[in-house]
Amino acid sequence: MMKTAVMFMLVVVINLMCSGEAQEVARTYCGRHLADTLADLCFGVEKRSGAQYAPYFWTRQYLGSRGKRGVVDECCFRPCTLDVLLSYCG
């Protein structure tokens, strides 16, 4: 009986660890580590030219919830996920 319970718990733990529903861990990325991580994540992502956007998109009301914060504010001063870092690619 004990062996069955241990095996069941082991299967549950492994399933949770491997599931896509697991939360991504937020970490801090600063300095060289931030630059290297961005370079690795953004490799091959096509960069967009700012010229394709009308100037009014750069006004404060169109900057969204990020405002003037940058990648250092979001990922060095506070922990962030890889999804946040990926949002700075391109």
Curated annotation (Swiss-Prot):
GO cellular component: extracellular space
Keywords from the named record: Cleavage on pair of basic residues, Disulfide bond, Hormone, Secreted, Signal
Disulphide-bridged cysteine pairs: C30-C76, C42-C89, C75-C80
GO molecular function, one term: hormone activity
Pfam families given in the database record: Insulin
Record note on quaternary structure: Heterodimer of a B chain and an A chain linked by two disulfide bonds.
Protein name, UniProt field: Bombyxin B-4
Organism, scientific name: Bombyx mori (Silk moth)
Gene: BBXB4
